[in-house]
Amino acid sequence: FLSVLYAQKNQAASTYQLRCCLRDIAVIELLFATGMRISELCSLRPSDIDLENNTVLIYGKGSKERILQLGNPEVICALMLYQDSFKTDISVCGYFFVNKQKHKLSDQSVRFMINRYANLAGIEQHITPHIFRHSFATLLLEQDVDIRYIQEMLGHSSISTTEIYTHVSSAKQKDILVNKHPRN
């Protein structure tokens, strides 16, 4: 999926296409790196993205704030390239992610963007922004991250909400039962 976005960037025939690709890459990278909700992503203000300290301030449901650290250099680079390319538009709009009319990027635009790249990648499964959130949580759980940390990163007030996102894959389940069961 990401390889298609980067290929589109490398094949961009115009400055406009390049800028769109830079924005789309930044959006997808940030969704996957943070597990944030699409509404949280679209509501980000320029001051919420701190690329000196590599943090994102997210305003979640119920006006709950959380700060997430960006640890992946590719995500940080994607955000820097986007920010440099859209600096004027971001300033005019007041939101970090901007559409071609220099307005706040909408939830629907992000959904359309994801569908477009999924089609280009030949992915037949319906891909939604929520899948990035689910994958974020599941992959962290599979790396043995405590579910309470995942709960905090996702902005859930209840651990039971987090548990919905974190189904254990069959491969991980097998590994646990074979290697960690007290009778083995």
Which residues does each PLM region occupy?
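Conserved catalytic core of the tyrosine transesterase superfamily
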Residues: F1-N184
